[in-house]
């Protein structure tokens, strides 16, 4: 299933790229995710002079000291409205997010999903004709559903839980390359 989704996303991105002209496509990565040892990549496409659409993905497969885990994958699409013009200056956005996670922190095992959305504000600085730096902060909602157990190595005693989260849902300091 993951291969099918990845193939579909790559096909869509390739098809969109074939119809775009210069400075209408950006590939980016979020430095804050890298600080948290989470590889990530995003692509942003101009829809008009003031609107862009972005799709970002992140994946954390690592196991840390003492067999601690915070594994997850995340997808976050976003539509942005630019006050000046695309890829320059202030913007506001609306984003959605979906993720799957597996955690063994705090002597509890949690295995679950989240979905939600929010609004964001950001600013994009032009560094050179092809490089930009973008800062963004988003607030919103996430519905989280997961299985939790006290015993990390076993699955006995699992409890189904749900929670609703309101607060920061996006934080980014990204380096972008514009085509």
What are these regions (language model features)?
Residues 25, 50-53, 87-88, 129-133:
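Repeated loop/turn-to-beta-strand initiation elements of outer-membrane beta-barrel proteins
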Residues 58-72, 98-114, 144-164:
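Flexible, solvent-exposed loop segments that connect beta-strands
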Residues 31-35, 57-63, 81-83, 96-102, ...:
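Transmembrane beta-strands of outer-membrane beta-barrel pores
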Residues 23, 35-37, 71-75, 111-117, ...:
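Residues that define the transmembrane beta-barrel architecture of outer-membrane proteins
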Residues 26-41, 64-71, 106:
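Solvent-exposed loop/turn segments connecting transmembrane beta-strands
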